[in-house]
Amino acid sequence: RVVPQGIPYETESWAWLLDPRWHGKVAVVNDPAIGLFDLALAVQAAGWMQFEDIGNMTRQEIDQLFACLLPLKQRGHFRGAWASVPESVEMMCNNEVVIQSMFSPGVAAVNGAGIPCSYAAPREGYRAWHGVMCLSSATTGNTRDAAYEYMNWWLSGWPGAFIARQGYYISNPQRSREHLSPAEWDYWYAGKPARTELTNTFGEVSVSAGSVRSGGSYDQRLSNISVWNTVMNNYEYTLPRWREFLLA
């Protein structure tokens, strides 16, 4: 491992993103609604500044945050910002980065390529998100029926089991449990050591026997959340600042 694994929730930290040991080998997701929170958590964890409400920053806090980040970017601390999961996988597999923002399918793909890659379980807590499907009140007839059928399909069990192999959770996990092997359920949801090798959605081995999911069980991980991804009141104010960061 290039970045030594620490003790979950004790020594692992968002501040690792700013550690000078990884200078030039750090990347973040190119999305101010996501990557901004990763960097804010890192800056706060490093003790450079504190936010009154990190999920809804003031303009003054946003300016102070970028005052911390721009000099780092100008000195080449960040390798770049990725715009897609395949791009993040390529960066990791090509050794362009050793630590970065990543989504679960990317981590599964890197492990599937035979390169050890794991999430940190930061002592400050996770940045969490939840995706939803919304139906317009103006939808009627066959279109509405098809939309409900699609949403019901997502909750039918099989889709939740499929995305579990990428590391994602679903809101009704018990429905998906029957579509997962006991070994898969124990690893992905219960936080137990993998009884056997487990495969990702491409059929590649992404979990070795005996390994434990970073952060532990579903309950343990959901109990350690620092901030939920939201669109802040000052989201639009962050856009030109984020572009300034990318171009620095």
Predicted segments, located by residue:
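Extracytoplasmic ligand-binding site segments that recognize negatively charged/polar headgroups
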Residues: R1-E87
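A ligand-binding cleft/hinge motif common to bilobed small-molecule-binding domains
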Residues: S101-P116
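Conserved C-terminal helix/tail region of periplasmic/extracytoplasmic solute-binding proteins
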Residues: G203-A248
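Solvent-exposed loop/turn segments at secondary-structure junctions
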Residues: V2-Q5, G24, P32-L36, P105-A108, ...
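Mature extracytoplasmic/periplasmic domains
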Residues: L135-R213
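Alpha-to-beta junction loops
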Residues: W22-K25, C93-I99
